[in-house]
Amino acid sequence: NPNFINLCLNENLSSEITLQPLKRFDLDAAIIFSDILMLPYGLNQKVEFEKGFGPKLGEVNIEEMSKLDEIDFVQKIHPVYKAIKKVSSSNIVKNKNKNTIGFVGAPWTLLVYIINQQSPKKNLKENFFKNDFLINRILLILEKFLKIHIKNQIDNGADVIQIFDSWAGLLEEKDLPNYIY
């Protein structure tokens, strides 16, 4: 759905989608309806979802990304935090003593999407690993904004944050200490 990001940015719909399973089943927690690619979106990279293909990201503008400040980033994805607050303060979560789970993509996995501009299972760019300077520069930006994103999720009611590192398996063992942390 090309409007998936818009759905994630609709605090009313995303909180309702999050709460639906708790209304039907006796689950331990509410997992926020969102996507790990909200972070690249917050960094002003175009993010769309194509039916039958998956995520497609626009060209990365490293200069724009490095100049982005915390206020602009948080403002762009603020509806995600409002949805977390809505879920964590909902009667079903509070009255049934349920936890609220937020999540992020790990730096490496986000880097793969940002540079590759799509899922690596579709195609991994041939020169992906050749620009260490670019990789390390983006990782530093991701570290900064992941901390902000995690803190905002917790400040708005997430009890725990799950970190997804979906593409760690692309690395050779010797590279793990450099990129998985």
Please place each PLM-identified region on the residue numbering:
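Short, flexible, mixed-charge acidic loops at enzyme active sites
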Residues: 45-57, 113-124
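Active-site loop segments of alpha/beta catalytic cores
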Residues: 76-181
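Noncatalytic linker/hinge segments flanking ATPase motor cores
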Residues: 17-27, 69-80, 141-145
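A short acidic, glycine/proline-enriched capping/turn motif at secondary-structure boundaries
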Residues: 36-39, 54, 107-109
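A gly/proline- and charged-residue-enriched helix-loop-helix capping module
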Residues: 52-90
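Short glycine/proline- and acidic residue-enriched helix-loop micro-motifs
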Residues: 3-4, 63-72, 128-135
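N-terminal basic, low-complexity leaders that serve as flexible interaction/assembly modules and, when applicable
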Residues: 1-45, 49, 89, 93-95, ...
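Generic, ordered loop/turn and secondary-structure boundary motif
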Residues: 5-9, 48-50, 58, 66-69, ...
